[in-house]
């Protein structure tokens, strides 16, 4: 057999056993839809030295007569990040530019609502990249391009390129071209491969195109090398040089001695369904085969951390353990903070997970025990945690950090062949330990201890064109091998984006300690055009958009951009402003209202009996629909007041709500949450017996697995059955449904507040801040969660920051009205906690304003208009069109484009029944969304020692949303 064929077979065998397809998935209306399909795919591969640039250009066709928005999820391998993004604008591809992630999100969403063409590529949880595309025209197409650089691994004596493909549907137009620049040896492919390389000048190229083609086989080729000689690529940059060096250090075989008492931490959260558990079990099989006799403790991790059992394995028989693992039920969110390995008896641990801790930071170690990266010990227990990942979507950085902090192994089953896996599990791992200090070399990455499996590569910056670098390798902390690398800019490969490979390596290292390195990660992403957690790539349609938002456009637009930037007036610049001045004005209005003496007024002249009868009519108890049109927004308040409740209709379609809660003391006002019947089809199968109903839930979940409403309703069912454990497990599954979905997390946070799970609510609200830092509602929700958990000072400071932070003018505009609500809540905290530090708070805002009744709502969907209505015992209704009642009731401003909040307050309540309604008025969302979730808080004796609160979450039905009218009665209470 020819030598190159041996090398290629080795490469192909490894690829066949180690890869998963990186198939982009397009979602429309939050789900994979046949409405839009991949019409054409062009793939361009360019290899320079040991670095490959891969670009996907995808054209999507809209089959419908509707304009749609799509979200494309693009998973990338461990250590690889997107560095190219382009979108078709007026028939021509336009390159994206890097922007801070929060700003990019805000700009994208604002422009989308003007119905023009922005594009956005952002990194979401794990190593996943999401691009948002709008519009996809009716019966039309949109084209996007995404690219990334990666270093090629060495297998045998060859560099191996592999692009996994497993497309399920045929593509109308498919093409692929691969180019090896300055190639000295012809790339090798197997006979079944459709790529055939030919010489083209100093390069080698291969290309093919097909019609109605279904790409099912990986694209692979190999480049023979001399691995004894380090490969070096260099790129000049402002008098310095970026370099990437790759070598193949010789390894000694050292047998790994596994402990005879191992703990298995098995991620049993909902996302566990996406892991390749067959591969996970193969890992355990390998260890058992080598160790034969051991004791295994099995721990299950989802929203809780529980011990499932202890298994004594003798002579390699682990049938009972295997059966237990194969029967695990995957449900709930993932809470890494619940794991405390130091208190467990096991000597070392195997963690099988995707690294996506949806309910806590991805860290097993409490703050008082945490050690700084890169030192590897959590404490003196010397318990290694080996992190094993088999999921295609994973947070590699989180798992690498846990392994590094505990001197454990990080094992990515998606990148290891069976042979490599066996070697990894049965031998000690060689580590790169650093470099010998050299004066003219700096910024070398990795700079920390790094496992070495085959080849190892390092990147850095040198101030001279020619120097030497010594790499240190060993086992544990002992240096046992030195590798000399010669850097010579005249001899090294000088093509390719070496600077981006360097930046990518630095980003990967800094990302492991993300919280400490946020600012530097942002700077790196912006300078090198790389998508990070803090930076995105954005495409705008017009030069005016780049000017308005102060974003430097791609090269072809920069001359006009800079010329016009000099000419623009101050009015053209998008400004930022705080809410403080508005809050002071609202505080004055509130104080004037609160100080007003409201007396019961009697009509001067007799009132006709027919009018009295009309006023005394009760609003129907379940669901009321007020028949008014959108034009009524423009009618005067007096006219609206006369028309309110003039026509009443009934609607049967309703959605289940939270459990009724009653105030215990008879002397206090009684708040009754209106019980709504369970009309969802899946609820009809439940019988009221928790264990049996849980089995029904699991069976039904197969059909509704990606439907948030299903978990929302099911959780409440079990909560009503007083099975809070199952309720929380089901509820927290919502966090696993979609990466970085703030609307889902807001929904989850509302329900957690209702269930008094305040610590978990704090984490959920804090994640929303990370994703939506541009919105005041994010900080308000977080502040109120802090207060509920007893952290009053932190809550006060955070709530005040809602008013003092600066916001873009469009955000400030659609949040107008939140100031009054925040002022009310600030004064409540101060009134009930007199020892808090408040010297930094504007004095004009402070005025105790206790009231007998306060009702407040907010909702989870942006660009949505939901209204609060409160009817008093006199049958007088306070709502946006009739903001003050005769007995002193007052409602805040109508928020029509945000998340709320809206509040009703009554200083002195009269005796009688009060009824609370909500009305879905409409939305301006570009893409269809699930039902809006409303959180309603009802207070009696607000800001008083006798204060009582009830919380209820309500989901509006699709039918009610579609009609854009109707009142839903959610509560009533006697005062």
PLM segments and residue spans:
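N-terminal, polar/Ser/Thr-rich
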Residues: 20-49
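An acidic, Ser/Thr-enriched
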Residues: 84-90, 95-124, 128, 132-137, ...
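Short beta-strand-loop
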Residues: 296-324, 342, 359-365, 396-402
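VWA/integrin I-like adhesion module and closely mimicked acidic/polar interface patches used
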Residues: 353-405, 411, 422-424
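Generic helix N-cap/helix-start motif at coil->alpha-helix transitions
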Residues: 673-676, 704-711, 724, 738-745, ...
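Intrinsic-disorder/low-complexity signal
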Residues: 829-975
